[in-house]
């Protein structure tokens, strides 16, 4: 038994790498068991081992060499599609089709596949009429047919190029000539007709199928708008889940790739990734809807307003039962916003059991240990039939069990709607940390394998969404779409009217970084805008959750905006003033890991508000040019992560101190980088390459009142403070005094200043 176990353990051995022109392969040796006839006569007759009775066969082992491509030219990667089909390596085909947009266009891949490898009537083939040539042509034909079938089935959106659909037309012409009447030809023809029909509907003013609408339902009837209190909590949660699931199922997974998402704010790409933008818009609409319903009626009494908050907490709990983590997070974030949290009298009227329920729901999105709770929950319940809830509150536990039992009795299975920012942040971090090319200019396909791990999770959860069996409620959707949403300034002003600001002598919690964020960076990718000046009244941290630096801050104010300035609210007004600061210090060292589902190329170092209004489009910095570093494919160094130094690399975030707010850009720092080189790379990413680099200095933010100036001759990797967040500022030299004067003229009593101040107003400045 021990020998058998050892044989199984050694059945696969790592053999190293093979390098050939245009490609690098990873080689493994695998022992494969084969059955042969026990006597020579049967073997001479060609009798297969599986055709003989037991006892007449003998087991033998054969060693097979398996090559997995790690990097290569585009030609080699496309050629490997054919060999992968022959080796039954369908995983490679899925990885390539899901990620090739990061290094090639649909036209380039299609031309290589069809013109170079798919020309079965070339002169060479015609001259050689041997049987082996015919068999080879048949093998290639079957391989190409299988690849095209998978392409049309898995990535149909690649061919959506209205109005003429050139790639789809080229593919259809090829299939008509080379494979008439085949299944791929029928699929291509049906897809072309579908695209053309949708284009006609769009031209006629009908809603596009890639955005959420009630296109399959009758028009909403007019009439008086219903009141929010008229809708039951389970109905609201079900309708929100219906809308979220419809949008999530339409998300094109490869649009989430960091290399694609980072191009969205270019002028020519304003229509890029519409399915993701629609999901973001729905998230933000719900967040603002929660705030509007709570603040909307000035005539409401404190008890009535508390009832509305209680209702939203119950709706969030129903969303949890439905495994709708997108709406759950939106509601929690809205209730944590500054304009809602500051209503102390209102929160005091919320029943204690609902406050405890709210804390438990908020803890799901705790950033402790790189958002471990939400990750484990998603992995555990992603494809399960029902939610699995455990509550420390007895009343909540009983209510949950009753609801779950009712679902089981009715035979209703639930899908899962994830928080999309989880995947976007992961893919953005992967794109930032891993190189596109290795030595020799070969495409780093190992990076694409890592990205596919995230893409595969998106596709799996999209399939799980088909388990939902819900129909739209016209009355609720009409109410939801007609809600008048408030801007951040409007909501805060209204909040102050409802409950006046506390006196200066009143003890209030210190500013903190919330553990729950909203989709405010989905339009920012690796860029994050932060609010440098905390308001007077800020929410406190949860009684049990941790706060601090979060890499899961992905959100957007509106579908049309590219940037979002922010601050964030909190969870419970139960803490004492000293508790939030203690929790903040305990959790400030938390960081994100690159292999996880919730990383981002940049985290948040200041407060984020789910209800922020976008700044002027004229002030939006252009997207940075993506730099390509050349590294060896044989490197075994772990990918760098934010807020953590590996052996000789790490990721830092750099913002420019100006009047447009603080937008962070992520930069990979090595142990060899000097200050001038880091400044030049930061200027390139912030589109400041036209300015002289000598005019700027690099400053690390130590705390709210301390900063560290990196000397021009220093090695940044060793000069920086590795015990605090890796947040830096690119500042013009000799501008400190002028900026402090500007800040001193800004009112300190208003909750929001007319012009954003800079981070330069700190009490202590450390110079090496």
From Swiss-Prot:
CDD domains: RA_RGL, RasGEF, REM. One of its GO terms (biological process) is Ras protein signal transduction. Keywords: Guanine-nucleotide releasing factor, Phosphoprotein. Residues 232-501 form the Ras-GEF domain. GO terms for molecular function: guanyl-nucleotide exchange factor activity. This is Ral guanine nucleotide dissociation stimulator-like 1. It comes from Homo sapiens (Human). Residues 648-735 form the Ras-associating domain. Changing residue 174 to S: In a breast cancer sample; somatic mutation. Probable guanine nucleotide exchange factor. Residues 541-561, 586-596, 605-621 have a biased composition (Low complexity). Residues 528-623 are annotated as: Disordered. The modification Phosphoserine is found at residue 520. Expressed in a wide variety of tissues with strong expression being seen in the heart, brain, kidney, spleen and testis. Residues 65-196 form the N-terminal Ras-GEF domain. Interacts with Ras. One of its GO terms (cellular component) is cytosol.
């Amino acid at each position: 038994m021990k020998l058998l176990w050892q044989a199984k353990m050694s059945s696969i051995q790592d053999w190293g790498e093979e390098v050939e022109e245009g490609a690098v392969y990873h080689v493994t040796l695998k022992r494969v068991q084969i059955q042969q006839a026990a006597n020579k006569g049967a073997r001479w007759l060609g009798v297969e081992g599986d055709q003989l009775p037991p006892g007449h066969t003998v087991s033998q082992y054969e060693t097979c060499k398996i090559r997995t491509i790690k990097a290569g030219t585009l030609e080699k990667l496309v050629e490997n599609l054919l060999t992968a089909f022959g080796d039954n390596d369908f995983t490679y085909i899925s990885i390539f089709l899901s990620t090739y947009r990061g290094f090639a266009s649909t036209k380039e891949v299609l031309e290589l596949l069809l013109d170079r490898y798919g020309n079965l009537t070339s002169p060479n083939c015609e001259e050689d009429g041997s049987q082996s040539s015919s068999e080879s042509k048949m093998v290639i034909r079957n391989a190409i047919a299988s690849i095209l079938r998978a392409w049309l089935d898995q990535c149909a959106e690649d061919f959506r190029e209205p109005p003429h659909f050139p790639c789809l037309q080229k593919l259809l012409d090829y299939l008509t000539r080379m494979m008439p009447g085949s299944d791929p030809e029928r699929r291509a023809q049906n897809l072309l007709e579908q695209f053309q029909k949708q284009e006609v509907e769009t031209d006629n003013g009908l809603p596009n199928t890639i955005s959420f609408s009630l296109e399959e339902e009758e028009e909403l009837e007019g009439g008086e708008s219903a009141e929010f209190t008229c809708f039951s909590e389970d109905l609201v949660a079900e309708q929100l889940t219906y809308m979220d699931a419809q949008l999530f199922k339409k998300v094109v997974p490869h649009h989430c790739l960091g290399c694609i998402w980072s191009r969205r704010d270019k002028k020519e790409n304003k229509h890029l990734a519409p399915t993701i933008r629609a999901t973001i818009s729905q998230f933000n609409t719900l967040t603002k809807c929660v705030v509007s319903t709570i603040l909307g009626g000035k005539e409401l009494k404190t008890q009535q307003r508390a009832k509305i908050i209680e209702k939203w907490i119950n709706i969030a709990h129903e969303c949890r039962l439905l495994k709708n983590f997108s709406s759950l997070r939106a509601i929690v974030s809205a209730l944590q916003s500054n304009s809602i949290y500051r209503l102390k009298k209102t929160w005091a009227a919320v029943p204690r059991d609902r406050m405890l329920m709210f804390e438990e729901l908020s803890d799901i999105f705790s950033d402790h240990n790189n958002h471990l709770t939400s990750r484990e929950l998603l992995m555990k319940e992603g494809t399960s039939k029902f939610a699995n809830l455990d509550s420390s509150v007895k009343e909540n536990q009983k209510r949950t069990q009753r609801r779950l039992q009712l679902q089981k009795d009715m035979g209703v299975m639930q899908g899962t709607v994830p928080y999309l920012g989880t995947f976007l942040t992961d893919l953005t971090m992967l794109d930032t940390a891993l190189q596109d090319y290795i030595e020799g200019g070969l495409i780093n396909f190992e990076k694409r394998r890592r990205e596919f791990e995230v893409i595969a999770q998106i596709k799996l959860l999209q399939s799980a969404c088909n388990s939902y069996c819900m129909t739209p409620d016209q009355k609720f959707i009409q109410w939801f779409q007609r809600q008048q949403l408030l801007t951040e300034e409007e909501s805060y002003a209204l909040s102050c009217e409802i409950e006046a600001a506390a006196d200066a002598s009143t003890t209030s919690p210190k500013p903190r970084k919330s553990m729950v964020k909203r989709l405010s960076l989905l339009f920012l990718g690796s860029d994050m805008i932060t609010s440098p000046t905390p308001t007077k009244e800020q929410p406190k941290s949860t009684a049990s959750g941790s706060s601090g630096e979060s890499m899961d801050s992905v959100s957007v104010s509106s579908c049309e905006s590219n940037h979002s300035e922010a601050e964030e609210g909190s969870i419970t007004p139960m803490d004492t003033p000293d508790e939030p600061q203690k929790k903040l210090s305990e959790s400030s060292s938390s960081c994100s890991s690159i292999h996880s589902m919730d990383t981002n190329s940049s985290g948040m170092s200041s407060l984020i508000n789910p209800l922020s209004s976008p700044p002027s489009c004229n002030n939006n910095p252009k997207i940075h040019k993506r730099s390509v570093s050349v590294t060896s494919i044989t490197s075994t160094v772990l990918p760098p992560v934010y807020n953590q130094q590996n052996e000789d690399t790490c990721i830092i975030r750099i913002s420019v101190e100006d009047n447009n707010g603080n937008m962070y850009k992520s930069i990979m720092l090595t142990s060899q980088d000097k200050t001038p080189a880091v400044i030049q790379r930061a200027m390139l990413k912030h589109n400041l390459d036209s300015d002289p680099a000598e005019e700027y200095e690099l400053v690390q933010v130590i705390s709210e009142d301390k900063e560290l100036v990196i000397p021009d001759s220093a090695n940044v990797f060793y000069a920086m403070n590795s015990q605090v967040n890796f947040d830096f500022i690119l500042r013009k030299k000799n501008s400190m005094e002028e900026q402090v004067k500007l800040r001193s003229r800004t009112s300190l009593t208003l909750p929001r200043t007319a012009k954003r101040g800079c981070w330069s107003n700190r009490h202590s400045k450390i110079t090496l």
